[in-house]
């Protein structure tokens, strides 16, 4: 939602979710949509751009990881001559999982008008549901122990582990054990173990679900 204050020929739009104010003057506005330039990175590199800044303030670690990975792959593809429509489509699908408000191209391709998002809230294709926290890591066998504090998990679920040092780790839950016995589902209040790269106590565990 938004609130509008009329000021002569210009006005200010305030986003209720973020409290961000956008100045609108004649036909020039700033867009609350997420700026995406990956599909014409080749043109930007051809033009001599050599530094790209990824905005990630107030975003989760999964956003930072996914965006940086995609743009890094795009630059490498440009350099080795494999920057293709197929790769762009694949990057777009990955970016859609973490972007919140839809995409626009900014003014890089000559548009005068900005774009307002049509979606209230998030337009990401995936949402993360908090499951629980890390308890300990057994480095000698590569096993992590977690406590389920909220939503249950099932074998086959896509999960996300985040933490200040761990960063963002995506994986599929292939096997899970409770009291050393394999189970299909872990529920609130249960401690469970699974194979994982190193995690830290208090790392957060999420279930990644597709929006329906």
Question: Locations of the language-model features?
Answer:
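Active-site mouth loops of central-metabolism enzymes
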Residues: 24-36
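Anionic-ligand-binding alpha/beta catalytic cores of soluble enzymes and soluble regulatory domains
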Residues: 57-129
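Conserved small/polar residues in nucleotide/adenosyl-binding loops
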Residues: 1-9, 211-212
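Active-site loops and adjacent core secondary-structure elements that bind or stabilize anionic groups
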Residues: 4-5, 11-17, 22-24
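Long hydrophobic segments that form regular secondary structure
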Residues: 36-60
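Generic recognition of flexible, low-complexity loop/linker segments
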Residues: 40-41, 59, 120, 132-134, ...
């Amino acid at each position: 939602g938004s609130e509008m204050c009329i000021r002569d020929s210009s006005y200010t739009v305030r986003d209720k979710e973020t409290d961000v104010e956008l100045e609108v003057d004649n036909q020039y506005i700033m867009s609350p949509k997420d700026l995406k330039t990956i599909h014409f990175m080749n043109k930007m590199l051809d033009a001599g751009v050599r530094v790209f800044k990824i905005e990630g303030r107030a975003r989760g670690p999964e956003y930072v990881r996914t965006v940086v990975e995609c743009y890094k792959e795009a630059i490498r593809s440009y350099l080795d001559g494999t920057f293709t429509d197929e790769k762009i489509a694949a990057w777009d699908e990955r970016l859609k999982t973490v972007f919140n408000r839809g995409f626009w191209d900014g003014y890089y391709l000559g548009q005068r008008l900005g774009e307002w998002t049509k979606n209230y809230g998030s337009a990401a294709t995936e949402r993360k549901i908090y499951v629980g926290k890390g308890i300990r890591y057994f480095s000698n066998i590569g096993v992590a122990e977690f406590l389920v504090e909220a939503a249950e998990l099932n074998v086959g679920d896509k999960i996300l582990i985040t933490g200040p040092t761990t960063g963002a780790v995506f994986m599929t839950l292939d096997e899970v054990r409770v009291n050393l016995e394999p189970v299909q589902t872990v529920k609130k209040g249960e401690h469970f173990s699974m194979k994982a790269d190193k995690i830290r106590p208090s790392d957060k565990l999420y279930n990644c679900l597709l929006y329906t």
